[in-house]
Curated annotation (Swiss-Prot):
This is Phosphate acyltransferase. Catalyzes the reversible formation of acyl-phosphate (acyl-PO(4)) from acyl-[acyl-carrier-protein] (acyl-ACP). This enzyme utilizes acyl-ACP as fatty acyl donor, but not acyl-CoA. The gene is plsX. It is found in: Cytoplasm. InterPro entries: FA_synthesis (IPR003664), Phospholipid_synth_PlsX-like (IPR012281).
């Protein structure tokens, strides 16, 4: 398999990108890597060229660039060239730590949507602290600020496939992020989406979930509109990290006995911190496009890059994209019936 890598995307590119790719190359013997980037910057960083190819580019999409304009105008950028390699069949997957909006645009307009998917979505695996499984899928994280009920329904399908194929969860359960657990909670979009998902034969829907319950493990897939999902993700991550910081500060200020107790608890704190560390978790996936497209945090280091390569490898090995396409192709009538029922409900 071949992975097209945007070597210039990210706060620490190209150094940490190249370091991560070399770690992954040594870890996985069946992956070839295509590094797209500025030759004078990338070439000196590679210590071993085994299964690594450099494709020189002359432009870089910066973090502050307007996504669609950058994709269209910077045709020789590392990100666009890597996306085109996937589109043209020269690579099997696309990786970047760069501009999220530009990567979304490249994934949708260059790699292309899976036929039958209305809107691709951004998904990630978050830690589950009390559930049956260690992780759950959370989507959409901001690919679509506003979503229709039919989009949320499709996210349930896409998220279920990711949970089963990549996380190895059998018969994953699905919940809808809302401002209350009751069926009649939320705005009209979420009320209608709840009814559509409730009657869905495509996945195992358990109802609504509130943001405070996200990490409790009550669902294997949590579906949200992009605005709510992005806000909930950042609030959850920020709160968790701040709590760990405050606990550590309280221990340090509690005298000798407190510090001794803190030393005993150190392994537990490290375990929790590791679960929350994006460098360990891998990247966010753009689900609903014709090939694996994965984005790591902009400040990701080599460890995150290497771990994300393993994540992409699993997606390819488990035929995630082709299985989604096959499911949609063979359930066209079911999906269309759901949309028609939705339209009838809206117009009633």
């Amino acid at each position: 398999m071949k992975i097209a890598v945007d070597a210039m995307g990210g706060d620490f590119a190209p150094l940490e990108i190249v370091k991560g790719i070399e770690i992954a190359r040594d870890r996985y013997d069946d992956i070839d890597f295509q590094l797209y980037g500025t030759a004078s910057e990338v070439k000196p960083l590679v210590t071993n060229w085994e299964r690594i190819e450099l494709i020189p580019t002359t432009e870089v999409i910066e973090m502050g660039d307007e996504p669609v304009k950058a994709m269209r105008r910077k045709k020789d950028s590392s990100m666009v060239r890597a996306a085109l390699a996937v589109k043209e069949g020269h690579a099997d997957a696309l990786f970047s730590a760069g501009n999220t909006g530009a990567l979304l645009s490249s994934a949708i307009f260059l790699v292309g949507r899976i036929k039958g998917v209305d809107r691709p979505a951004l998904a990630t695996a978050l830690p589950s602290f009390e559930g049956e499984h260690d992780q759950f899928v959370f989507m959409d994280l901001g690919a679509n600020a506003d979503s229709k009920p039919a989009h949320l329904y499709q996210y349930g399908i896409l998220g279920s496939f990711y949970a089963s194929h990549v996380l190895g969860i059998q018969s994953p359960t699905v919940r809808l992020l809302n401002n209350g657990a009751e069926e009649d909670k939320g705005d009209e979009v979420h009320k209608v989406a709840h009814q559509l998902m409730k009657n869905a034969p495509s996945f195992n829907f358990l109802g609504n979930i509130e943001a405070r319950e996200l990490l409790e493990g009550t669902a294997d897939v949590v579906v949200a509109d992009g605005f709510s999902g992005n806000a909930a993700l950042k609030a959850t991550e920020g709160t968790a990290l701040m709590m760990l910081k405050q606990i550590k500060a309280a221990i340090m200020d509690s005298g000798t006995r407190g510090k001794m107790g803190g030393a005993l608890l150190k392994p537990a704190f490290k375990s929790i911190q590791k679960k929350l560390d994006y460098n360990e978790a891998g990247g966010a996936v753009i689900l609903g496009v014709k090939a694996p497209v994965v984005k790591t945090h902009g400040s990701a280091k080599a460890t995150a890059v290497a771990n994300t390569m393993g994540q992409i490898k699993t997606m390819i090995d488990q035929h995630l994209v082709s299985d989604i396409q096959n499911y949609i192709d063979t359930h066209t009538e079911e999906l269309q019936a759901g949309k028609e029922a939705l339209n009838a409900q809206i117009n009633a």
